[in-house]
Amino acid sequence: MAGAAPACADPAPVIQAMRAHDWARAQALAAAFPDPIAQKLVTFARLLTPDTASAADIGAFLAANPAWPDQAALRHRLADAITNDPDQATSLADCQAFKPNLDEALLRCADAERLAGHAETARALAQRAWIEGVRDAQDEAAFLTDWPDAATPDVQWRRFDALDWARDPAAARQVARLDPARHAEAVARQAFQNRDPAALDDVADIPQAQRADPTLLLDQARWLRATGADAAALALWRGAAAAAETHAPPDRRPAFWTERDRLARAILATGDNEGAYFLADDPNVAPDQAPDALFLAGWIALRRLHDTPRALIKFQSLQAMSHSLITQGRAWYWLGRALAGEPAHQAMLHAAAYPTTYYGQLAIAQLSGAASIAAAIESAVGPAVPPAQAKAFAGTEMIRAATLLIGWGDPHWARQFLLRQAQLATDAARFALVASNAASLGLPDVSVQTARLAGRQGIVLPRLGWPAPFDPPATPGVAPALVLGLMRQESSFDPESVSPAGAIGLMQMMPATARQVAGQGGQDLKNPDLNMRLGIAYFSGLLRQFGGTLPYAIAAYNAGPHRARTWIAENGDASTLAPDVMIDWIERIPFAETRNYVQRVLENTAIYAAHGAK
């Protein structure tokens, strides 16, 4: 069976030496390889290891190798080196040269500047460290003893604000240190976050001028929705909250949209379509969230308000603002739904030009029938790469490093080099080269992730982006194309994948679910065959639970069967109604992750079926 590059049980001696931190032996072993990249990899690994290099060495490597992976980790090591260097003169020089951001390094730099007689610079650095870090209670006490004049009222408020925004428990300790004029606002924010039923009473103690604070109003809006007061939350958004959003810091704007989106979907269930439209029509939405806001507003206008002019404005804006394949397919499809006659037909033709997307496939089905989807997918052509460019790319440091690491039995590390190249790619040929090299090195997950990044720039990798490195076992009622589509979305075909929640392997099985399906524990869920067998068995059971309705089963696989049943109860059962109703049902899933998941798995399934995995 084909598959991904396995993690070698007996990695090369040079890898073993690096893992043992035997750097002299590792360099000697690397020197035996004709490619100098071998020795550079050892240097790189050493620089990434705590307490093995000076700040100057790490800084020099960073400056000379901006395209190498793990840039953030290197900067962290650089900050650690500055923090731990006992020499004042060296620390001062490194602080001034590299300007670290981590709070421990900031404090070390503050000390060095203070000893050098640079009092104002030292104080400013200490204040940055206090605002951005120093989370431990003992460290707080030490800081306040060492820098008694640094925690000014303004600085102390900024510290509370940063910790509170990050939902750090240390925020609660800061309230007593605040200027009395800001105390009531901080108490109210904490009360809203803690779902205190009496939180609104705290607002009465806040000076009027502070009640328009954007974060305070966002916390209040969240509290109202979470406590079931949707109408009051909408009223707040129609008044103070929407006005405050215009003054929110740019890095907090995404949170405002997330809350508006959640409330809009809850308000839809009550039948207040105008209220839901108001929430979706967010004039201050952050750029990354703008496509979602435009689409939701357009969808509500068309499907709930039956207001075609407003819907067209939103869908046209959506189409114009992004090159993403998914966004283009979605925008053109819904323009086709909103328009009539020949303009509608032309819009659907535009949507059908994106056959690897969910809405592109729906457009093809509407234009010429579902049977035409496979041919359209097969006709999609990826970027052409001149042989000379392919040869040159294979000779770059990143590809040489990845190739060497695969040979050394460390596919995990090789993956980082290829993913970094995908992140830096800006043209179609380079995306294709990263994906093809990943495929040849046995890293299909990198090919998939590269295709996703390319898709955001309007570039399709029709074959490279949908590999089939594993053969799903034959299972009645569960087509191989569907299993491949699930695995692509779940793990990108990385059998070693472990999610933050603890889901494991190709089909991201939770150990408890695997025990339930298998009737026993102790299973090696990183084993591809076992993972597929258990995952397919679980999905097959979901299909039976939901009467064979694929979108319901897919939603249940992602979010759990209880949530899927809740959504059916709230939004109606679309399984026996016209296809348009199911399209709307999917769009009404309240979790953005699950909405996206269902659409991606459906489009993946069609692609794999077109590729022959029936």
Stretches with model-predicted labels:
Residues D10, A38-Q39, T43, R75-L78, ...:
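TPR repeat positional signature
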Residues Q27-I37, L47-D51, G59-D70, A81-T83, ...:
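Solenoid-like repeat scaffolds
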Residues A17, I82, E113, L163, ...:
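Residue at a conserved register position within TPR or TPR-like alpha-solenoid repeats
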Residues P36-I37, F44-A45, G59-A60, A64, ...:
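Catalytic glycan-binding domains that act on GlcNAc-containing polysaccharides
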Residues P13, L41-R46, L78, C109, ...:
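Structural register within alpha-helical repeat arrays
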Residues A5-A45, A376-M398, G407:
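N-terminal leader/linker segments that initiate helical-solenoid repeat arrays
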Residues H21, P86, G117, R167, ...:
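Residue-level detector of the short coil/turn that links helix A to helix B
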Residues A26, S91, A122, A172, ...:
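Single-residue signature of alpha-solenoid repeat helices
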